[in-house]
Amino acid sequence: MSAKREFSHITLASTPFKKRIDQNSLKTDSDIEKDTNIAHKCAERFNYNTNLHRKVTLSDRFELAALGYEMKAKPRTIIEKHNDCDEFHFIYRKEKKNDYGTGSPLSAGLSLSNPLPAGRGFLSPAIQNTSNQFTFSGSPRITPQKHTPVSANHKPARSIFDDIPSNIA
């Protein structure tokens, strides 16, 4: 998770999906109670870490999802707070919106048209723009990923050494 994102505390929501999981797996009341205790501990750990502005681990969220609890991005209503029913709502705090104004530059690899961060399995726009310039010169058994026709007019790729003056002593 990015350090710039801020999450508020979460609340758990027992859903029909959770009830169906419990019924299909023939869980006893004590097993269901154990699951709720584990879910409460995960949520408390999540909330504790976010309040201290620590990085929140994915394991808590995965564990909650494995137990069948759903995390929602809306706060509890006043009516739900007064009812205090057995259903608990462990919800994920909404992320702060980043201001992409003229004053704040986008973080590396991000753009308004492409909000995905550069990372594994993702080509940044800079790499995508230059990938058409490279021609394939490998063995004939390997097929090229991108092949540009020979008749296409394109400029040779600039080297990082082009800007260095030749009379360096």
From Swiss-Prot:
Tissues in which the UniProt entry reports expression: Expressed predominantly in the germline (at protein level).
GO BP: 21U-RNA metabolic process; piRNA processing
Observed phenotype of the null mutant: RNAi-mediated knockdown results in defective activity of the PIWI-interacting RNA (piRNA) silencing pathway. RNAi-mediated knockdown disrupts the localization of tofu-6 to the perinuclear region of the germline. RNAi-mediated knockdown does not cause chromosome segregation and cell division defects in early embryos.
Marked site positions, May be required for interaction with erh-2: 61
UniProt keyword Oxidoreductase, yes or no: no
CC terms in the record's Gene Ontology section: cytoplasm; nucleus; perinuclear region of cytoplasm; RNA cap binding complex
Keyword field: Cytoplasm, Nucleus, RNA-mediated gene silencing
Stretches the record annotates as Disordered: 137-169
Major localization listed first in the record, in broad terms: cytoplasm
Subcellular location as annotated: Cytoplasm; Nucleus; Cytoplasm, Perinuclear region
Record has ATP-binding as a keyword: no
Function: Component of the pid-1 variant of the PETISCO complex which is required for the biogenesis of a class of 21 nucleotide PIWI-interacting RNAs (piRNAs) that possess a uracil residue at the 5'-end (also called 21U-RNAs). Within the complex acts as an adapter which binds to the complex via erh-2. Involved in the biogenesis of 21U-RNAs which guide the piwi protein prg-1 to its DNA targets for silencing. Plays a role in small RNA-directed transgenerational epigenetic inheritance.
Self-association state and partner proteins as the record states: Component of the pid-1 variant of the PETISCO complex (also called the pid-3, erh-2, tofu-6, and ife-3 small RNA complex) containing at least pid-1, tofu-6, ife-3, pid-3, and erh-2, which is required for the biogenesis of a class of 21 nucleotide PIWI-interacting RNAs (piRNAs) that possess a uracil residue at the 5'-end (also called 21U-RNAs). Within the complex interacts with pid-3; the interaction is direct. Within the complex interacts with erh-2. Within the complex interacts with tofu-6.
Protein name: Protein pid-1
